[in-house]
Swiss-Prot record:
Pfam families: DUF3586 (PF12131), Inhibitor_I29 (PF08246), Peptidase_C1 (PF00112). This is Cysteine proteinase B. PANTHER family: CYSTEINE PROTEASE FAMILY C1-RELATED (PTHR12411). It comes from Leishmania mexicana. Belongs to the peptidase C1 family.
């Protein structure tokens, strides 16, 4: 692979020249608004710089990012911007880590349009709103760290959703397998989602390992050798991929029927994003891979819901909303998806197999005594769906072999770290001062 080739999210070596200093770093420009905010930023994110020169450079970066933040806020009345964990990075550092590779990606987009199968979508009946988080098809937000691996997170997030919607349990899959093993892409130096799908099909028979068996370790920018451990577990299998029509109506129709879509966009407006809907998103070049998980056209400002890979402490618990209908951030330029054969166990054929049963409802019995016999209340709950609670929280209940997992969340989308509790399927278990029995019912 040519070393000079650029790629989506490519990470260049950025040299920030800082003057040497023997004295330890100390607070500078105390009393100015920017300096006060900078001190708060350092406390919040645990920053400590080795020299006074480096601290001065980081403060200068911080001040410049404050200016950019205010510019974005002035252009986006439906969104809120603020100080994020990226604010001590220079524009060059941030772009090199997260926003590089436009020229290569443009060429790759043209190649995809010519050589990949195009999906068709029924445009006659597009729902007003869809959110695949609420239907259990999206894993928790992840963090690529200081590695240009957004392409892997976008591709893996798409496969996770397609695997679930083909009739399987939602499972978190391995980005590290792609970052370390996929030689059609460039690991932390960038890549493309369609090429990730191609590599899986050509080299692993479409198999992707679980995150538990092959966890992500490249958040510091280091890419270890590809693992061939006998302890790796196959979590999903794809059998193809499609290029989705690059109109937003076609994307909405396909997403509503088929699930989350891997897309590329211009993330130049994302550094200081906190919440709300971006209506004036920069759209100059594709530079970042993300996952489109839903949309809502019922309000004053219609918007897309996008899962990012910058951690749950960025944006709306790791998500961003972007206005629909104007190709904001160039988000309709490169929508793609893997394809999963319905109800196939990893590495098997469905030609003569009965589809695996899928949990539909959980019968939950909560009782006052310890044996699930007295003062009991029975409730039927839809499995694998996000259920909003009062006060802005939500809960989800999931079935897996021999156990049931109940999770509560502080947000309405069942994303991020939840408080989870497991019980055996169909068996009584202690629950607070009484007992509980969860029984999964399948189709």
């Amino acid at each position: 692979m040519a070393t000079s080739r650029a790629a989506l999210c490519a990470v260049a070596v950025v040299c920030v020249v800082l003057a040497a200093a023997c004295a330890p770093a100390r607070a500078i420009h105390v009393g100015t608004p920017a300096a006060a905010l900078f001190e708060e930023f350092k406390r919040t994110y645990g920053r400590a710089y080795e020299t006074l020169a480096e601290e001065q450079q980081r403060l200068a970066n911080f001040e410049r990012n404050l200016e950019l933040m205010r510019e974005h806020q002035a252009r986006n009345p439906h969104a809120q911007f603020g100080i994020t964990k990226f604010f001590d990075l220079s524009e060059a550092e941030f772009a090199a880590r997260y926003l590089n590779g436009a020229a290569y990606f443009a060429a790759a987009k043209r190649h995809a349009a010519q050589h990949y199968r195009k999906a068709r979508a029924d445009l006659s009946a597009v729902p007003d709103a869809v959110d695949w988080r609420e239907k259990g098809a999206v894993t928790p937000v992840k963090d690529q760290g200081a590695c240009g691996s957004c392409w892997a997170f976008s591709a893996v997030g798409n496969i996770e959703g397609q695997w679930y919607l083909a009739g399987h349990e939602l499972v978190s899959l391995s980005e590290q397998q792609l970052v370390s093993c996929d030689d059609m892409n460039d690991g932390c130096d960038g890549g493309l989602m369609l090429q990730a799908f191609d590599w899986l099909l050509q080299n692993t028979n479409g198999h992707l390992h679980t995150e538990d068996s092959y966890p992500y370790v490249s958040g510091n920018g280091y890419v270890p050798e590809c693992s061939n451990s006998s302890e790796l577990v196959v979590g999903a299998q794809i059998d193809g991929h499609v290029l989705i029509g690059s109109s937003e109506k076609a994307m909405a129709a396909w997403l509503a029927k088929n699930g989350p879509i891997a897309i590329a966009l211009d993330a130049s407006s994302f550094m200081s994003y906190k919440s709300g809907v971006l209506t004036a998103c920069i759209g100059k070049q594709l530079n970042h891979g993300v996952l489109l998980v839903g949309y809502d056209m019922t309000g004053e400002v219609p918007y897309w819901v996008i899962k990012n890979s910058w951690g749950g402490d960025w944006g709306e618990q790791g998500y961003v909303r972007v206005v629909m209908g104007v190709n904001a951030c160039l988000l309709s330029e490169y929508p793609v998806s893997a394809h999963v054969r319905e109800s196939a166990a990893p590495g098997t054929s469905t030609s003569s197999e009965t589809p695996a049963p899928r949990p539909v409802m959980v019968e939950q019995v909560i009782c006052f005594d310890k044996n699930c016999t007295q003062g009991c209340r029975k409730t039927l709950i839809k499995a694998n769906e996000c259920h909003k609670n009062g006060g802005g929280g939500a809960s989800m209940i999931k079935c897996s072999p021999q156990k049931v997992t109940m999770c509560t969340y502080s947000n309405e989308f069942c994303v991020g770290g939840g408080l989870c509790f497991e019980t055996p399927d169909g068996k009584c278990a202690p629950y607070f001062l009484g007992s509980i029995m969860n029984t999964c019912h399948y189709t």
